[in-house]
């Protein structure tokens, strides 16, 4: 199973920020921000992100600082093949940033799928290489 690493998360947060101009966070199941367009938030606890990860529900926050480490915005849990990947949080008025959270989710799915396909392709290439190297040995045994 694939996991979202910091490199993939950074691709998503930076791309989405370029589109919407808002801060974007990736939050793990423990509620820790592991990638963000705001470097000061990386490694900090995000209470609503943690709650969204635990419940699997999208949570909208309508005011800053009502919850520990949380700003106004939307927090969307991301699943891939029914497996929790992360929570994507986007700062701003929920009605304005909701569409960007869904965009970030779609981009994340596409990048995970791309990695999955690359791994499958690499595995098949490795198997072909092994078979081609083993073929002369099998021919010698057959003689």
Where are the predicted features?
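Hydrophobic, helix-rich cores of sensory/ligand-binding and other regulatory modules
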Residues: 2-143
């Amino acid at each position: 199973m694939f996991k979202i690493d910091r490199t993939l998360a950074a691709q998503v947060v930076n791309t989405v920020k370029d589109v919407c101009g808002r801060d974007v966070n990736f939050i793990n199941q423990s509620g820790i921000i592991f990638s963000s367009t705001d470097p000061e938030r990386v490694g900090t606890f995000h209470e609503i992100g943690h709650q969204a990860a635990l419940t699997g529900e999208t949570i909208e926050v309508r005011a800053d600082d009502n919850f520990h480490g949380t700003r106004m915005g939307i927090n969307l849990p991301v699943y891939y093949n029914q497996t929790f990947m992360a929570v994507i949080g986007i700062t701003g008025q929920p009605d304005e940033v909701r569409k960007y959270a869904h965009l970030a989710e779609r981009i994340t799915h596409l990048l995970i799928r791309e990695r999955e396909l690359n791994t499958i392709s690499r595995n098949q290439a490795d198997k072909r290489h092994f078979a081609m190297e083993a073929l002369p040995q099998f021919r010698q045994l057959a003689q």
